[in-house]
Amino acid sequence: MARIAGVDIPRDKRVVISLTYIYGIGKPTAQKILKEAGVSEDTRVRDLTEEELGRIREIVGRLKVEGDLRREVSLNIKRLMEIGCYRGLRHRRGLPVRGQNTKNNARTRKGPRRTVANKKK
């Protein structure tokens, strides 16, 4: 397994797919990286030369990926919660942040249902 940005990427897959195992690199970014490095997308990781791997590592090193990106995202969320804006309040309460309805759905954000006891008449 080749190691890029602290992540072991699978050897038997195509390079463009293997790069997506790194947090912060999706398919479009992987394609741009390979184009800049001058590596074909169809190449398997096991067939890469050390020189090609070095070029890919250098390009990925310039991007914000893995731990740095995770830290930035969590700090952004923490900042929103501290300044008390609407999005921060939604994060604090564990509700959807982007305006989705919460009457019926939003179970992923709200967690499992908590049944409320009915008042007897």
UniProtKB/Swiss-Prot annotation:
**UniProt keywords, alphabetically:** Ribonucleoprotein, Ribosomal protein, RNA-binding, rRNA-binding, tRNA-binding
Family, per entry: Belongs to the universal ribosomal protein uS13 family.
Enumerate the PANTHER family for this protein.
30S RIBOSOMAL PROTEIN S13/40S RIBOSOMAL PROTEIN S18, SMALL RIBOSOMAL SUBUNIT PROTEIN US13M
* Family matches, as HAMAP family: Ribosomal_uS13
The name under which this protein is listed is: Small ribosomal subunit protein uS13
Q: Which Pfam families match?
A: Ribosomal_S13
Species lineage: Bacteria, Bacillati, Bacillota, Bacilli, Bacillales
What does it do?
Answer: Located at the top of the head of the 30S subunit, it contacts several helices of the 16S rRNA. In the 70S ribosome it contacts the 23S rRNA (bridge B1a) and protein L5 of the 50S subunit (bridge B1b), connecting the 2 subunits; these bridges are implicated in subunit movement. Contacts the tRNAs in the A and P-sites.
Q: Where is the composition biased (Basic residues)?
A: 106-121
